[in-house]
Regions:
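Catalytic cores of nucleotide-sugar-dependent glycosyltransferases that transfer UDP/GDP/TDP-activated
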Residues: 1-472
Length: 472
């Protein structure tokens, strides 16, 4: 039996703030389902203040011990919970994890150094030393680095996944020993460009390196995408692979989704039309069944391609369309969408908020989903929109390239519309193509059906990870 420990700083449904939480909430369960009796998959994460009492009531205290982090001697409690066949461990320390948010504290470096040290220190007390420790992003990078520098368990292999190379865990060398409890000799391991870089350290130290889509694995070898780490990535390319994320197709299922007004299927789509009318009413837009809704559900930040949207928004709105925006982010984009909604009240609904229930209704009601990202390691929104029959229009980058294939009228293959060059008018041309397809009802029905039948399950990804673990 292969023993796997999945180390993460967040996981749904316990505590999450982004894509890593979705992955950590779904992949371990799928690994267990795919591996059956041949794998023992367990997950460890911090016990944040935001973990609900409902889950706390299901936990049992597994063990308590003291973690030595340089001169600090810190309490650690390990709580255990079993859910969907997977054992979850929660690292308890209120000083580090009883905060208002998961990240963004001045001492995040110390918090996650403690977490990483606690993970390795707990293995003997809980009686579970894994064959493979699978760490994720800079917050658990020190698990891999500590293991390499201290050789905790010689037989244990380490897999490290980069979910977004922009976040690297950079700190001053002044805290190498005082906070990270690393010897001076570790400077060569974690040092990069004049500072500590935890992501770089894990890349160098791990036995296998993965990222969240095959295309992103190729992209981060280039200077444009690698945020300075292209040399390190290329030096370690022999152990790099890209495995496309999936989505939770039970939660995101238009056939049985209690969070949308009307359920529907690829064969019986009438519920989607009803949802569209209800969404138009809810958002104060004219109820026009034949006017396509173009939706964006996104963080309103530059790398999501919003500068392209701002550049040609007026051109887009000259067509018979309605534009629905949901998200928060940089004030320049929030204000732009508020302004354009004021000027085009019958065409634009700008919802500057985070609302997962409204997001579901938008996915289930819209016709076209726009995702013109400058970079996108994997992306989940394009998969969710396709699942709900909202045809994605995406730029060919990262996971968007791997998951959305352009519709070909000659073969009737393809589940969306794509464009390659990061250019506002190339994006606009893709939108015009989508609108032309939309006006041809038999063609649009085929594209929508292809999108809804796309395989975005975690099962495929889980098998690739299991093969990776076996080959270490």
């Amino acid at each position: 039996m292969k023993k796997i420990l999945f180390v993460t700083s967040e996981a749904r449904p316990f505590a999450a703030s982004g894509g890593l939480g979705d992955v950590a909430g779904s992949l371990p369960v799928s690994l267990k389902e795919a591996g059956g009796e041949d794998v023992d998959v367990r997950v460890v994460m911090p016990l944040y203040a935001s973990v609900s009492q409902e889950f706390r009531d299901q936990m049992t205290l597994k063990c308590k011990f003291t973690v030595k982090l340089a001169w600090r001697m810190q309490y650690c409690g390990v709580f255990e919970l079993v859910r969907d066949g997977v054992t979850y461990y929660f690292i308890d320390n209120e000083y580090y994890f009883k905060r208002n948010s998961l990240y963004g504290s001045f001492d995040d470096g110390e918090r996650f150094a403690y977490f990483s040290k606690a993970v390795l220190d707990m293995l003997d007390p809980i009686g579970f030393v894994p064959d493979v420790l699978h760490a994720n992003d800079w917050q658990s990078a020190l698990c891999v680095i500590y293991h390499k520098c201290r050789d905790y368990y010689p037989a244990m292999k380490c897999v490290f996944t980069i979910h977004n190379i922009e976040y690297q865990g950079k700190y001053s060398f002044a805290i190498l020993g005082d906070v990270f409890d690393l010897p001076q000799s570790a400077e060569n391991v974690v040092g990069f460009d004049g500072s500590i870089n935890l992501l770089k350290g894990a890349i160098v130290c791990c036995d296998a390196l993965t990222t969240v889509s095959p295309q992103y694995a190729n992209e981060i070898k280039s200077e444009y995408f690698a945020q300075g780490l292209h040399g390190i990535i290329n030096a370690n390319a022999y152990k790099l692979s890209g495995i496309l994320n999936g989505i939770d197709t039970v939660y995101y299922n238009p056939e049985s989704d209690s969070e949308i007004p009307n359920e529907f299927t690829a064969k019986c789509i009438s519920g989607k039309a009803k949802n569209k009318a209800e969404l138009q009413k809810e958002l104060g837009l004219p109820v026009k069944p034949d006017t396509p809704i173009i939706a964006m559900i996104s963080r309103l930040v530059s790398h999501k391609g919003l500068d392209l949207v701002c550049r040609v928004a007026e051109d887009m709105l000259n067509a018979d369309v309605q534009l629905v925006i949901l998200g928060t982010g940089e004030s320049v984009y929030e204000n732009f969408f508020r302004d354009i909604a004021d000027r085009y009240p019958d065409k634009v609904s700008a919802n500057i908020a985070f609302d997962k229930f409204l997001a579901k209704r938008i996915y289930a009601s819209s016709d076209i989903f726009l995702m013109p990202s400058k970079s996108e390691p994997c992306g989940l929104a394009q998969m969710i929109s396709a699942r709900y029959g909202t045809v994605p229009v995406v730029r060919e980058t990262g996971g968007l390239y791997d998951s959305i294939k352009p519709y070909n009228p000659e073969t009737d293959q393809g589940n969306g519309i794509t464009f390659a060059t990061y250019n506002a008018h190339d994006m606009l041309d893709a939108i015009w193509r989508a609108l032309a397809f939309y006006s041809d009802k038999p063609v649009w029905k085929k594209i929508r059906k292809n999108a809804m039948k796309s395989d975005f399950t975690w099962g495929r990804s889980a098998k690739e990870y299991l093969d990776l673990y076996k080959n270490l």
